[in-house]
Design a protein with these regions (language model features):
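Active-site cofactor/substrate anionic-group-binding motifs, chiefly glycine-
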Residues: 1-2
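Short linear loop/turn motifs
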Residues: 23-33, 46, 213-219
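Phosphate/diphosphate-binding glycine-rich loops and adjacent basic-rich segments that engage nucleotide
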Residues: 32-79
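Glycine-rich tight-turn/loop motif centered on a GG-T
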Residues: 11-21, 55-62, 95-99
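A glycine-rich helix N-cap at a beta->alpha junction
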Residues: 11-37, 107-113, 117
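Short, structured segments at the rim of ligand-binding sites
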Residues: 6, 22, 187
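Well-ordered secondary-structure scaffolds
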Residues: 61-64, 68, 78, 82-226
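Short acidic, glycine/serine/threonine-rich loops at helix termini
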Residues: 6-10, 41-43, 49-53, 95-100, ...
């Protein structure tokens, strides 16, 4: 079924006070104030997706390409995006077990998003083994903070750099992906990416003192297994 492994929202909610249930006005305020936000699908953003999600779970259509496409792209289109980078997993631990299946899904999502006026690329990521070194909501928050600190596992960092570089090139912030890669490496190394994450946490409900501690010593905020 869906929802048993924990998604991005579950991981962020391991941070005390982090509010992912933003309405459209709160999303716009966050983007205006700190340049980014991460929010869960809700009744104001693609309300039909919640219904589709539940239907997929009980009708054995979790891996249906049209339904996956509808679920993912509906939310992106509702946000009014101009550019989108999709990370399509493939391998034993993914819904799409083979590269052929993953390419079919990627093509479906790119075609649908492009048809809605969203400049889109899809990148395939191997999921025959875990990415990074941490598994579990709180632990993956710790690993993510380590990457933002300029450290972290090399494969997780590489995903961030490659996908970020693609988005920078697509939006014209960088001349090409090579320049985008250099810019991504720079913001991870100089701490500015970490600063933006801290500001986003505060904007989305985390106490300032907690956010400050999170970016310095995440284990003290989200905890670790005994």
């Amino acid at each position: 079924g869906l929802g048993h492994t924990g998604g991005t929202i579950d991981k962020l909610e391991a941070i005390p006070g982090f509010n992912c249930a933003l309405d459209p006005q709160a999303m716009m305020e966050a983007v205006e104030n700190v340049g980014c936000c991460i929010a869960v699908q809700n009744e104001a953003i693609a309300p039909a997706d919640g219904v589709l999600y539940a239907i997929r779970d009980v009708t054995d259509t979790i891996d249906s390409v049209p339904l996956i496409t509808a679920s993912i792209i509906s939310k992106k289109a509702a946000e009014g995006l101009s550019a989108l980078v999709l990370d399509v997993k493939t391998g034993r631990a993914a819904f799409m077990k083979t590269q052929e299946q993953a390419r079919e899904l990627a093509a479906s999502m790119v075609q649908t998003a492009e048809g809605l006026g969203i400049q889109t690329v899809a990148q395939l990521t191997a999921m025959d083994q875990p990415i990074g070194t941490h598994i579990g909501n709180a632990l993956e928050v710790i690993e993510s903070v380590r990457v933002l600190q300029g450290e972290g596992s090399p494969d997780t960092r590489e995903l961030v750099v490659v996908q970020g570089a693609a988005l920078l090139a697509m939006t014209g912030v960088s001349a090409d992906r090579d320049e985008g890669r250099r810019r991504m490496e720079a913001v991870l190394n100089n701490g500015s990416a970490l600063d933006h994450f801290r500001e986003m946490c505060i904007q989305q409900g985390v106490e300032e003192e907690t956010a400050q501690l999170l970016v310095r010593n995440p284990e003290r905020v989200v905890g670790t297994a005994p």
